[in-house]
Amino acid sequence: MLVLGLETSCDETGVALYDSERGLLADALFSQIDLHRVFGGVVPELASRDHVKRMLPLIRQVLDEAGCVATEIDAIAYTAGPGLVGALLVGASCAQALAFAWDIPAIGVHHMEGHLLAPMLEENPPEFPFVALLVSGGHTQLVRVDGIGQYELLGESLDDAAGEAFDKTAKLIGLNYPGGPEIARLAEQGVPGRFVFPRPMTDRPGLEFSFSGLKTFALNTWQQCKNAGDDSEQTRCDLSLAFQQAVVETLTIKCKRALKQTGLKRLVIAGGVSANKALRASLEDMLGSIKGNVYYARPQFCTDNGAMIAYAGCQRLLAGQQQDLAISVQARWPMEQLPPL
């Protein structure tokens, strides 16, 4: 089955072609970072308009790269949520229109299920069951995964997601959008130990997260430095390192608890923050200490992309899942509501 995947949940337009027998044939992405940077964050209306502009050229691009024609496509998968409603509607409308014109099925895919399954595109994919850490700008969740659609939420953030905390903290100390990569870059030059941040909710049982306090701690620390006349680049580096260490150690502690609670030794990390090198290194060390394994997608598939949507949609279509031509998207969509395969 040859599936065209469309991703438009936020500020990246992703298109890919995935074949159930040959694997990923082509993948293209247009990022709107430059468009939104001047505003310090994503402007939903601008995101939607840019998706409209980029979608059809990217579809033509992946068809050319794969050496395919439209008549060879068996189905279309598109992101139906969660995300920005206007942006989601661009992908959904395009998918359903093409599906109607080409007389093929279209299926809406859960954005975070796409992220969760992205490591399945790698040469050494994880086997079920496993624990997944979904960590992005909008989500921080620990999930037990027994199969596609078989999800048990173990814990999640009570306030800011980890990626959101990265971006907000970066903005507070004067870094460019998107803030996560900027903090990671500066952290490489930071002096360990100059600042010590708390590890929120690690001193009590449970698998919930809270990152809003770290953002406040960073702001107060930065203001103290500025009041003392020290708002140098090195101070930004030191603060970035301390903040990143706090987030990474908190995530690692909770992942270790989740593995112990479930009795599993396979961990998948997915979502934009899973590209963070410090987080990967910390989780690899932790899994090594318990003789377990950690899995993640290549960096280009950690952020939003069409390949993960094409793959997830293909699995559900092969299992016989069907959908009518109604255009329906959801800004919020608990993953536990998905039907199991």
Swiss-Prot record:
<keyword id="KW-0012">Acyltransferase</keyword>
<feature type="binding site">
    <location>
        <position position="111"/>
    </location>
    <ligand>
        <name>Fe cation</name>
    </ligand>
</feature>
<feature type="binding site">
    <location>
        <position position="304"/>
    </location>
    <ligand>
        <name>Fe cation</name>
    </ligand>
</feature>
<keyword id="KW-0819">tRNA processing</keyword>
<feature type="binding site">
    <location>
        <position position="115"/>
    </location>
    <ligand>
        <name>Fe cation</name>
    </ligand>
</feature>
<dbReference type="GO" id="GO:0061711">
    <property type="term" value="F:N(6)-L-threonylcarbamoyladenine synthase activity"/>
</dbReference>
<comment type="similarity">
    <text>Belongs to the KAE1 / TsaD family.</text>
</comment>
<keyword id="KW-0963">Cytoplasm</keyword>
<feature type="binding site">
    <location>
        <position position="276"/>
    </location>
    <ligand>
        <name>substrate</name>
    </ligand>
</feature>
<keyword id="KW-0808">Transferase</keyword>
<feature type="binding site">
    <location>
        <position position="167"/>
    </location>
    <ligand>
        <name>substrate</name>
    </ligand>
</feature>
<feature type="binding site">
    <location>
        <begin position="134"/>
        <end position="138"/>
    </location>
    <ligand>
        <name>substrate</name>
    </ligand>
</feature>
<dbReference type="Pfam" id="PF00814">
    <property type="entry name" value="TsaD"/>
</dbReference>
<dbReference type="GO" id="GO:0005506">
    <property type="term" value="F:iron ion binding"/>
</dbReference>
<dbReference type="InterPro" id="IPR043129">
    <property type="entry name" value="ATPase_NBD"/>
</dbReference>
<feature type="binding site">
    <location>
        <position position="180"/>
    </location>
    <ligand>
        <name>substrate</name>
    </ligand>
</feature>
<dbReference type="GO" id="GO:0005737">
    <property type="term" value="C:cytoplasm"/>
</dbReference>
<dbReference type="InterPro" id="IPR000905">
    <property type="entry name" value="Gcp-like_dom"/>
</dbReference>
<keyword id="KW-0408">Iron</keyword>
<dbReference type="InterPro" id="IPR017861">
    <property type="entry name" value="KAE1/TsaD"/>
</dbReference>
<dbReference type="InterPro" id="IPR022450">
    <property type="entry name" value="TsaD"/>
</dbReference>
<comment type="function">
    <text>Required for the formation of a threonylcarbamoyl group on adenosine at position 37 (t(6)A37) in tRNAs that read codons beginning with adenine. Is involved in the transfer of the threonylcarbamoyl moiety of threonylcarbamoyl-AMP (TC-AMP) to the N6 group of A37, together with TsaE and TsaB. TsaD likely plays a direct catalytic role in this reaction.</text>
</comment>
<dbReference type="GO" id="GO:0002949">
    <property type="term" value="P:tRNA threonylcarbamoyladenosine modification"/>
</dbReference>
<keyword id="KW-0479">Metal-binding</keyword>
<protein>
    <recommendedName>
        <fullName>tRNA N6-adenosine threonylcarbamoyltransferase</fullName>
        <ecNumber>2.3.1.234</ecNumber>
    </recommendedName>
</protein>
